[in-house]
Amino acid sequence: MIKALEDDLSQTFDIHFNNHALLDEAFTQASYVNEHPHQELKFYERIEFLGDAVLQLIVSEYLFKRYPEMPQGKLTRLRAAMVCEASFSDFAKECHFDQYIRLGKGEEKSGARQRSSLLCDIFESFIGALYLDQGRAAVERFVRIVIFPKLDEGKFDHIIDHKSELQELLQKNGDVEIDYELVSEEGPENDLIFTVSVTADHKKLATGTGHSKKVAEQNAANQALQLLRRPK
């Protein structure tokens, strides 16, 4: 099972572990260890502890740099949404990690392999193992593939919502007409890039791009916010 995981990591992410025991530990649950007492196995909880801390730091730094104007409270809410159980569980399934967990027979029968809390733990423990094996740079490369693109895909728009923020800023002194207009669609049909402009009382403020009109509108609003908040 671990050999299949190594092949998957190699083909999908170009990740090659040096210390294979770390990968074994990261994907082994306590129930499996208890059923194999003579194999001197370790389970994932200690590595998970480390992975959680590494993810918190890397995601925090990324958000801090990506959104230089975002208030601390909103940064905290956005980070909480990105590093929560539901998000990590989704990321684990996207990476096929659920296929490679070593479980005891009882846990397997109970459906633990698809349990959100376990998948979250496994994602964190994998990050911990990758950090121990190859350092922070390797973890950053991985999360730039798996986690950060979700921001551009609109997964966390319910927290960011630059459009509402822009509306509040522009209309604090009276009514302002804000419009979003599709400027262009470029690229192949299965990978379109949309460009949207945002105007206030028919005056163009900024443009934004994204893989959907919704995301492009949010990015246009974010660009407008940054321009409006710059010191004059």
From Swiss-Prot:
Q: What is its EC number?
A: 3.1.26.3
Q: Does the keyword field hold DNA damage? A: no
The record, for SUPFAM superfamilies, names: dsRNA-binding domain-like, RNase III domain-like
What InterPro entries does the database record attribute to this sequence?
Answer: dsRBD_dom (IPR014720), RNase_III (IPR011907), RNase_III_dom (IPR000999), RNase_III_sf (IPR036389)
This enzyme catalyses: Endonucleolytic cleavage to 5'-phosphomonoester
Q: Does the keyword Isomerase apply?
A: no
Q: Which GO terms describe its biological process?
A: mRNA processing; regulation of gene expression; rRNA processing; tRNA processing
Recorded hits in Pfam families, A to Z, give: dsrm, Ribonucleas_3_3
The protein's required cofactor(s) are namely: Mg(2+)
Question: Where, by residue number, does Mg(2+) bind?
Answer: E48, D121, E124
Q: What is its main location?
A: cytoplasm
Known function: Digests double-stranded RNA. Involved in the processing of primary rRNA transcript to yield the immediate precursors to the large and small rRNAs (23S and 16S). Processes some mRNAs, and tRNAs when they are encoded in the rRNA operon. Processes pre-crRNA and tracrRNA of type II CRISPR loci if present in the organism.
What is annotated about its quaternary structure and interactions? Homodimer.
- Its protein name is Ribonuclease 3
Q: Which organism is it from?
A: Pediococcus pentosaceus (strain ATCC 25745 / CCUG 21536 / LMG 10740 / 183-1w)
Which classification does the entry list for the species? Bacteria, Bacillati, Bacillota, Bacilli, Lactobacillales
Tell me what gene encodes this: rnc
